[in-house]
Amino acid sequence: MKTNPLFLVPLCLIILSCTNTSEKDLIEQIDPTEPITYSEHIKPVFDSNCINCHSSPAINGAGVSLTTYNNVKNSIENTNLIDRINWQPGQGGFMPLGGTRLPQNLIDLIIQWQSEGFVE
């Protein structure tokens, strides 16, 4: 059975068009006029990236739980949480431990939430 090689060209084009070019393509963009809130924007970031260790109670040597609004707010205000998620993998204290660095737009979102006064 012979296969028409022209069939492969459209197939390759379809496959290539399904790729993304940046991490921002993978994350829903937020309306810049909308206030950043813990419940809608910040909690999902921490739930997806932090509570494997920073649960209640914290495990794997994690020093604090990051499961509630007050836990996260206090960690940002009283520890170097934002610095630790900003560091590059391999730096001592980098978070998430053993994971990959959060996309910059998520780090920026957390910083913006802080600058807007930690809206719940």
Residue ranges of predicted features:
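Aromatic- and Gly/Pro-enriched helix-to-coil junctions and flexible linker segments
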Residues: 18-120
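Sec-dependent bacterial lipoprotein signal peptides
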Residues: 1-17
